[in-house]
């Protein structure tokens, strides 16, 4: 007899050691122990020919143990029994940065879990706001929560440290610690349409919040670089077109805050000059 099937964690504080319980009876017995696979297991006490050696398991896996017994006249193979070794799960989740609110965290797309030869029995996520940033919260969506294997989370602007813990039968859970940094979306105050006369002086363009930049809605209009230009930190619009033709020119104001870009569009109507014959 060689005992029964056993399980254990290779990463627990106490090493996973199995004593092979040999109850064979007879005179002048010789023993040969065989373990398959051989990688990840070693003899803690004794060797392959010891009566009741001890095995130390250092890697997760399913190991088959067999005992061959002989006394010179007879050879017998006892039935194989299995030892299941597992380890602390490995969890991989990359840091999240350069995102604009709301940021949709889809767990199945971002979480990698190596169960290390044992089923995950418990999951727990912890989300903690980092100091120095006014994090505005998050919402669990799609029926998930902080105990879901793959939680789905909508983050508002934030700076969080997230700990994702996945536990099997090992005493210590596997963890991934990662950062979530989501920038705040700051909208552009709606731009009113405006008018200007053909060939008038260039007009300074203004918008709120300040610090953004202007572009033409249609960058292919003739002489675009002269119509919209920047000088001394200000953007100017110059209506230098056919003096006798009415035009509508679309202008777009962009404002960036980190990864967030807000935009608004206005129409500049250009009135033609009077035509005198």
Regions inferred by a protein language model and the residue ranges of each:
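A short beta-strand segment in extracellular, disulfide-stabilized domains
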Residues: 13-24, 103-115, 200-209
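Surface-exposed, flexible coil segments in extracellular/virion-facing regions
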Residues: 31-55, 126-151, 215-240
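Short, exposed coil/turn segments at beta-strand boundaries within extracellular/luminal domains
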Residues: 47, 72-78, 168-175, 258-263
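Solvent-exposed loop segments of extracellular immunoglobulin-like
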Residues: 24-32, 116-129, 209-216
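Coil residues (strongly favoring Ser/Thr
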Residues: 6, 28, 48, 78-79, ...
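Hydrophobic/tyrosine-rich beta-strand signature of extracellular beta-sandwich/beta-rich modules
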Residues: 67, 162-164, 251-253
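Proline-enriched interdomain boundary motifs that mark the N-terminal boundary
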Residues: 1-4, 88-95, 185-192, 273-277
């Amino acid at each position: 007899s060689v005992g029964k099937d056993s399980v254990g964690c290779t990463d627990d504080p106490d090493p996973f050691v199995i004593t092979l319980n040999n109850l064979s009876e007879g005179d002048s017995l010789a023993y040969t122990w065989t373990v398959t696979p051989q990688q990840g297991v070693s003899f803690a006490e004794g060797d392959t020919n010891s009566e009741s050696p001890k095995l130390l398991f250092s890697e997760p896996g399913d190991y088959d143990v067999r005992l061959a017994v002989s006394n010179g006249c007879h050879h017998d193979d006892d039935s194989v029994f299995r030892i299941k070794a597992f380890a602390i799960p490995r969890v991989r989740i990359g840091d999240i940065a350069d995102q604009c609110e709301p940021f949709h965290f889809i767990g199945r797309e971002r979480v990698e879990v190596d169960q290390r030869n044992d089923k995950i029995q418990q999951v727990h996520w912890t989300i903690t706001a980092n100091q120095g940033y006014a994090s505005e919260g998050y919402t669990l969506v799609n029926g998930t929560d902080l105990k879901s294997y793959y939680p789905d989370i909508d983050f508002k602007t934030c700076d969080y440290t997230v700990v994702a813990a996945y536990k099997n039968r090992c005493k210590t859970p596997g963890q991934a610690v990662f950062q979530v940094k989501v920038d705040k979306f700051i909208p552009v105050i709606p731009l009113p349409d405006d008018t200007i006369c053909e060939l008038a002086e260039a007009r300074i363009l203004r918008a709120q919040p300040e610090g953004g930049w202007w572009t033409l809605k249609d960058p292919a209009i003739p002489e675009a670089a002269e119509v919209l230009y920047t000088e001394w930190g200000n953007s100017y619009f110059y209506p230098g077109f056919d003096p006798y033709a009415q035009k509508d020119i679309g202008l777009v104001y962009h404002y960036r805050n980190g990864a967030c870009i807000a935009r608004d569009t206005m129409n500049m109507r250009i009135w033609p000059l009077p035509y005198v014959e």
